[in-house]
């Protein structure tokens, strides 16, 4: 994306100052939030949504995100949810993956390979998630739990959140179930607290990450957490990733969406 090198340079200069002074770090975050670079991803995602692409030369205007084909307003706030056509609970990214394959003719493996952007290559998925997430701004998170598979996904995610595993014997709860924890400069939210959980899911991801000069999504956040716990790679749009997202978003019910967020 044009200008990413400049954004990265500005963040590189700003963050060492914050490292010396926590208040300086907060000021840096506020400056980014006031003129959020993530809006560039929102604009690109909107173009991609309506552009006719892929082997089938189709847009995503027939993609049903749960509220009807092409309806993006409020869709993010009502995900993950059960979709009869796939007989699965899907979050935004896994649902977009389904639509990009079935409607546009892209190969699943190609989308998965380029799911996360780099300094040299932008991710279509991250842009689309940014656009669709922003179309729920001002609305409250309200993941449905009426279908048995939605409740099953929530319960599975709860189990996974608390399950200790891997060489470090860590779980998600190891870092996110107590107050006052931090990794380096990053304060860790206590996800057992309802208000903090609402903030995480409603204003957290997708978010512009200053240290990476890119927007990252919830799937990326979960992937990275798994890696930090020295666990096997978490499959993109996998049943496990959607279960964890279902638990987090279910717990964050009522949070007011404001996306994309801004993170270190």
Task: Please give the residue ranges for each predicted region.
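Internal, well-ordered alpha-helical scaffold/interface segments
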Residues: 126, 130, 151, 155-159, ...
